[in-house]
């Protein structure tokens, strides 16, 4: 994306294609609040100040299986470094749909672990209190397992928190979260260490 007008145009295009706010946020790697602002601004209704957010475009990595492979190796190295400190092992790598899946499947292969897939609730436009995402039954089980959570970007940390809570409710042990970009700048979420290739910290 070149500028704010490109982001607005892409957000409107995605909405016209049937994506809901959470899915648009995931696709553009921005918060739901930013998507709402982009869509409101496209209608030129009211001048509302822009939320403080950063759009991350990692498509130059995502379009190449070779680049994804090398990035997954770097994330594996960081995950193993974290696990060594606690003498923990990894049983299952949990990919957060949709953007965490390619990296998670490659990491599971590299780490010799099972692969599980988590469908977040962010794909729903209206999220009811207590509503949760789900672990797909078509992939590995997480029950009683040591888990590594993999996603592309942490924006507010809400999806990561959702996955951690869901895994714990299922008797799993989330050991580390691995992401390409951490926009929240947190060392941990719910006492689970965060490993990111890039950490963004706002200074304003």
UniProtKB/Swiss-Prot annotation:
SUPFAM superfamilies reported in the protein's UniProt record: PRTase-like
Key word Transcription regulation present: yes
Gene Ontology molecular function: any one: DNA binding
Taxonomic superkingdom: Archaea
Keyword terms of this UniProt record: DNA-binding, Transcription, Transcription regulation
Repressor listed as a keyword: no
GO biological process, one term: UMP biosynthetic process
Domain notes: Contains an N-terminal DNA-binding winged helix-turn-helix domain and a C-terminal regulatory domain (or effector binding domain) resembling phosphoribosyltransferase (PRT) domain.
UniProt record similarity statement: Belongs to the purine/pyrimidine phosphoribosyltransferase family. GfcR subfamily.
Protein name: Transcriptional regulator GfcR 1
């Amino acid at each position: 994306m070149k500028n704010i007008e490109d982001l607005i145009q892409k957000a409107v295009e995605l909405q016209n294609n049937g994506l809901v706010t959470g899915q648009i946020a995931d696709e553009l790697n921005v918060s739901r609040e930013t998507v709402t602002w982009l869509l409101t601004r496209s209608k030129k209704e009211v001048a509302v100040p822009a939320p403080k957010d950063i759009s991350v475009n990692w498509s130059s990595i995502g379009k190449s299986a070779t680049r994804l492979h090398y990035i997954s190796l770097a994330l594996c190295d960081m995950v193993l470094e974290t696990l060594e400190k606690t003498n923990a092992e990894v049983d299952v790598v949990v990919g957060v749909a949709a953007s965490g899946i390619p990296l998670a499947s490659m990491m599971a292969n590299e780490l010799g672990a099972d692969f599980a897939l988590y469908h977040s609730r962010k794909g729903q436009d209206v999220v009811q209190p207590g509503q949760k995402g789900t672990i797909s039954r078509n992939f590995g089980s997480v029950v009683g397992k040591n888990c590594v959570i993999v996603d592309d970007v942490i924006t507010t940390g809400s999806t990561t928190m959702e996955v951690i809570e869901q895994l714990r409710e299922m008797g799993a042990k989330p050991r580390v979260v691995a992401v390409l970009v951490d926009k929240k700048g947190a060392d941990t979420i719910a006492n689970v260490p965060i490993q990111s290739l890039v950490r963004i910290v706002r200074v304003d």
